[in-house]
Amino acid sequence: KLAMCLVNLSRLKKGDVLLDPFCGTGGFLIEGGFMGLKLIGSDIDDDMVNGTLLNLKSYNLTEHIISIKKWNAGDIKSFLKQLNVKYVDGIVTDPPYGISTSAKGNIEEIFNNLGDVLKKDGYLVFASSRKINLDLELMEMYELYIHKSLTRYIHVYKKTDN
């Protein structure tokens, strides 16, 4: 349910390109595939990448895949360059809690770099355990109470310039 909600918040339409740079087992990519989106995903963990591919196959969504690959989200530009993709239409992701140990750079730096590969008027939608301020325009933020020691913040940022 949360995956569908976040993908819907990205305002993508059929045929658009969705990027999830922390794809895990592919929940956002699966929802994107159901919506007819083209899918690009990466994760730093081989097992997660393999799980994403298996899950997309089990839902018969492999025809939507542009690329799913092991890659560090802190260097997403070079990943997209290999695909001859300069910009994506939208980004939906949920970085791991231990982000500082699993991706180079801090989370703000990584997300601002993601903004560089986002098309003008595209949306970056993500969940995190704290409020995160970026160079993009914050359109919406939602607090999702999980339990007494965990609240998730759903951020919806828009790229308003190139």
From Swiss-Prot:
CDD domains reported in the protein's UniProt record: AdoMet_MTases
User: Which Pfam families does the entry link to?
Assistant: UPF0020
Q: Tell me which domain of life the UniProt entry assigns to the organism this sequence originates from.
A: Archaea
Q: Where is the signal peptide?
A: none
Q: What class of enzyme is it?
A: transferase
Instruction: Work out whether the entry's keyword set contains Transferase.
Output: yes
Set out the biological process GO terms recorded for this chain's protein: tRNA methylation
Q: Which GO terms describe its molecular function?
A: tRNA (guanine(10)-N2)-dimethyltransferase activity; tRNA binding
Record's catalysed reaction(s):
guanosine(10) in tRNA + 2 S-adenosyl-L-methionine = N(2)-dimethylguanosine(10) in tRNA + 2 S-adenosyl-L-homocysteine + 2 H(+)
Main location as per UniProt: cytoplasm
Q: Where in the cell is it found?
A: Cytoplasm
Gene3D superfamilies membership: Vaccinia Virus protein VP39
Matching entries from InterPro entries are given as: DNA_methylase_N6_adenine_CS (IPR002052), RlmKL-like_Mtase (IPR000241), RlmKL-like_Mtase_CS (IPR053943), SAM-dependent_MTases_sf (IPR029063)
**Record's family?**
Belongs to the methyltransferase superfamily. Trm-G10 family.
| Known function | Catalyzes the adenosylmethionine-dependent methylation of the exocyclic amino group (N(2)) of guanosine at position 10 of various tRNAs. Acts via a two-step process that leads to the formation of either N(2)-monomethyl (m(2)G) or N(2)-dimethylguanosine (m(2)(2)G).
Task: Summarize the subunit comment.
Answer: Monomer.
Read off the PANTHER family from this record.
THUMP DOMAIN-CONTAINING, TRNA (GUANINE(6)-N2)-METHYLTRANSFERASE THUMP3
Query: What's the name of the protein?
Result: Probable tRNA (guanine(10)-N2)-dimethyltransferase
| Naturally occurring in which organism (per UniProt) | Methanothermococcus thermolithotrophicus (Methanococcus thermolithotrophicus)
